[in-house]
A protein has these predicted regions:
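Membrane-interface interhelical loops and short amphipathic "cap" helices
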Residues: 31-48, 109-121
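Alpha-helical transmembrane segments of multi-pass membrane proteins
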Residues: 17-35
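Membrane-interface transmembrane-helix boundary segments in multi-pass integral membrane proteins
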Residues: 177-224
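Hydrophobic alpha-helical membrane-insertion segments
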Residues: 95-99, 157-176
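Alpha-helical transmembrane segments in multipass membrane proteins, preferentially the mid-helix core
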Residues: 133-151
């Protein structure tokens, strides 16, 4: 990244840090209120929404990037020194982009039909942060200001790990009824269509295939867009350096 990209990255990651922090504080406050004033059995199951988890991961990634970019500005270190953190940021961005598209394509239209889905609409309370602001800041910031080039093209499949771990934790909680018992909403699962006990087995499989497929598609799109942008910038920087050396001779 050149100085312009570094400053832009620092600004965007700082914005992500502040906006998601607000969402986290509000969510914690809501859970505390539910536990102490509504139902003492209520715990922190609201944090098992994929939206909340991916936003927290993005928040952590933004903190890492603020530190890394600041070090790059002052110490002139290259991306190679922090390649793993850039890949972590990539994974977090795919996760929040997934939630943005999922809500936009499914929950937003359903919210106009069913009152139950209005709670997760894109414009309701802090959802505007977790469903719109943070995902878009993360997406545009990563694609246009942060580059994690690698010759290993399978890197775009890494976001599947985040989705897999979420499913690995969610399914047992739903099947055993733990989520329904301790969540603030007392829904059977974080999302109605993820209720693996009520839904037909084939519906569950189709849902999982859709989620994995969408994650893979988003990962490929973001990765190769990022890679193309980096390649173009690298060629420009290389040509500029060659031109400078030639003029100095």
């Amino acid at each position: 990244m050149n100085k312009k990209h570094q400053v832009a990255s620092l600004t965007i990651n700082s914005s992500i840090f502040l906006t998601v922090l607000v969402a986290i504080i509000v969510t914690i406050g809501r859970s505390v209120r539910a536990q102490y004033y509504v139902n003492p059995e209520v715990t922190w199951m609201d944090f098992f929404y994929y939206t909340d988890i991916t936003n927290i991961v993005l928040w952590v990634a933004s903190i890492c990037m603020i530190i890394i970019v600041s070090m790059q500005i002052h110490n002139k270190k290259t991306y190679k020194s922090f390649k793993g953190f850039y890949i972590f940021k990539f994974i977090s961005v795919v996760g929040t982009t997934f939630t943005f598209l999922f809500v936009f394509l499914i929950f937003f239209p359903l919210g106009e039909i069913n009152e139950k889905y209005k709670e997760v609409s894109m414009y309701n309370g802090i959802q505007i942060i977790t469903h719109i602001i943070a995902p878009l800041l993360g997406l545009f910031g990563f694609v246009f200001t942060e580059y994690c080039p690698t010759n290993k093209k399978w890197t775009y499949t890494l976001p599947l790990v985040e989705m897999f771990v979420y499913m690995l934790i969610l399914i047992p909680l739903v099947v055993t009824g733990v989520y329904e018992k301790y969540s603030c909403t007392h829904w059977e699962s974080p999302y109605p269509f993820t209720n693996f006990m009520s839904n037909p087995w084939w519906a569950t499989i189709l849902y999982m295939i859709f989620c994995y497929g969408l994650t893979l598609g988003i990962g490929a799109g973001i990765y190769f867009s990022n890679y193309a942008a980096f390649t173009k910038l690298y060629v420009q920087d290389t040509n500029a350096k060659k031109h400078k050396i030639k003029n100095n001779k």
